[in-house]
Amino acid sequence: AAVDVGAAGVAVYDPVESVGEGSSAARIDERVSDLSFVVDRLEADAGGIDELRGRLDLGRIGVAGHSLGGIAAAEMCADARVDACLNIDGQQIGGPFSARRDPSPPTKPFLFLTKETRLHPALVEVFEAAGADAYRVVVPAATHGAFTDGSRYEPRLLPVDGTADHVLAIERGVVRAYFDRYLRDVTGPLLDGLPAPTDIYAEVYPLRGRPTLPAG
């Protein structure tokens, strides 16, 4: 996208795709293809691999990713073989949680784990139109990089408040509770009974009587 200031001094928005946007969209598409390929190969070969035989339930598949990988995970909601998607702080490239301009809202359980306390209206609309349970978990202390273990080693990725281990502990608790619920049918106090779509501000627990996340 770009903004052009015309002769009258009025800024006119031009929705043309920027170079960076096009490059990021291509990288997301590549990740989605890779994820789909992994599922293809597991379906075709898992039974013949000794280390995997009997260990995988391919009837229950969840996908999670961070940043562009999070958008790719959201895109995988469109794959009929995927049961739940989790996007960690990947917002939009072409459209909300997508490399495309006009994506469809997720029809599978969807969780967005983010540092953002406020979302663009287009992202909010995705939650309002979601065809299944949709959650937004906000960790205000986090930075984009704090959701990765790189924050333990690179000072520029540290959270704005608290410690790297603190944010990672929240992330682990949310990811586990979400996939426990939607892949293993194991309910717990973090998500059980909450209306969907809903917001969980992880830093202000307890919420509606729910307990705080574990420290580790």
Stretch-by-stretch model annotation:
Residues 38-102:
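Primarily recognizes the serine-hydrolase "nucleophile elbow" in alpha/beta-hydrolase
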Residues 1-18, 140:
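Active-site machinery of serine-nucleophile hydrolases
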Residues 12-58:
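Alpha/beta-hydrolase active-site loop
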Residues 31-38, 72, 171, 175:
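Stable alpha-helical elements in mature extracytoplasmic
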Residues 83-144:
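The feature captures the conserved acid-bearing segment of alpha/beta-hydrolase catalytic domains
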Residues 141-143, 150-216:
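Alpha/beta-hydrolase-fold serine-hydrolase catalytic core, especially in secreted/extracellular enzymes
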Residues 35, 61, 136, 179:
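Divalent metal-coordination and catalytic microenvironments
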